[in-house]
Amino acid sequence: EQQRYLNATKYIKLVIVADNVMVRKYTHNLIDIRKRIFEIVNILSLIYLSMNINVALVGVDIWTNGDKINVTSAVEPTLASFGTWRERDLLNRKTHDNAQLLTGINLNGDTVGYAYIGSMCMPKQSVGIVQDHGKTYHLVAVTMAHELGHNLGMDHDRDSCTCLANSCIMSATISPSYQFSDCSQNDHLRYLISHTPQCILNEPLRTDIVSPEVCGNYLLEEGEECDCGPLWNCQNPCCNAATCKLTPGAQCAEGLCCYQCRFIKAGNVCRPPRSECDIAESCTGQSAHCPTDRFHRNGQPCLNNHGYCYNGNCPIMLYQCIALFGAGTTVAEDVCFNYNLDGQGFFYCRRENDRIFPCAKEDVKCGRLYCKVYNDNVHPCRYQYLDNGMVDHGTKCAVGKVCSNRQCVDVNTP
């Protein structure tokens, strides 16, 4: 099952947001801004093909009437505000996997981009900021590829990392390279194994893609029946690479329910359950695509009552601690969670518009997560200071209660 997940083609449904400084920088010429974004995404897509990832632009949001958040040269608060806005506003308007803020502001120091690491599919953290630096779009595209790489679990390259170019995409300094290093590929693989983000398994609808249609870019767009890439590289006998139409007699060219150009018979499982909270999906016999992922109702007990189902998963603090600090880690003692009452530094429940709010006593297990590494009595309250160090939504925080919006609420609360 894990190998099947790792081998599957991934799809990142991307929204790019241009801030108001971008609007003024290009003298309110929205056509030029959209053209620049399309050019950036074309290169971004090309870069990620080597990772078996298709990047599809499904939305462009241009802040013509002023910024929706406080955009400043300080990257950390700006990224946090952008993530909050994405969760509360953008996701409610447009289904997507990741959002990148393209800003005309000069970011602090030599910084031209910033993103959370290992955060793909997370409502608040699957975001990045990219400065529109340089006259050509090539370096901006490489910068966005770098920040997206962080979201996909890649860290900065070390001196020992190599690729086919003099420098690689995840170099700590800006590089014109289109190549990922061996370290980046290993980082990404480890991230997929440990986090298995599910949203990137879903292929975008052809009607969702907003960039101009191109036959030969591996993305199924309006007017196409298939797209197996450029003519010189297509290896799919079911698809005519020159026309992006199915070959004679073919019902399909790809998909979890497509085999040798024909629909797989009804009843064959195409998506096994990933946890006891998930439900298996089967082919219908009428489509190449696996039906929409379904799961058991939120709030159903799981893992021997250690947790409650939430969107197909069973989030518990123990597994979150292991993901952060590795095997041999457990949840810290209850007293550690009282740090979340402070409302200072990294110890809080909520952060909004650069302000942090302490947890109420009953909500301390919905703020920062605290873990203990086996036999380490020197640091009994370990924590991760980034946003992925917060307790996950849907996690059990008390008997009959789960974390929702950083509050410990009744498990049956909508």
From Swiss-Prot:
GO terms of molecular function: metal ion binding; metalloendopeptidase activity; toxin activity
Note accompanying the cofactor annotation: Binds 1 zinc ion per subunit.
Tissue expression remark: Expressed by the venom gland.
Subcellular location field: Secreted
Subunit structure: Monomer.
Function comment: Snake venom zinc metalloprotease that induces apoptosis in vascular endothelial cells (VEC), without degrading the extracellular matrix (it cannot cleave collagen) or inhibiting adhesion of VEC. Has also fibrinogenolytic and hemorrhagic activities.
Protein name according to UniProt: Zinc metalloproteinase-disintegrin-like batroxstatin-3
Lineage: Eukaryota, Metazoa, Chordata, Craniata, Vertebrata
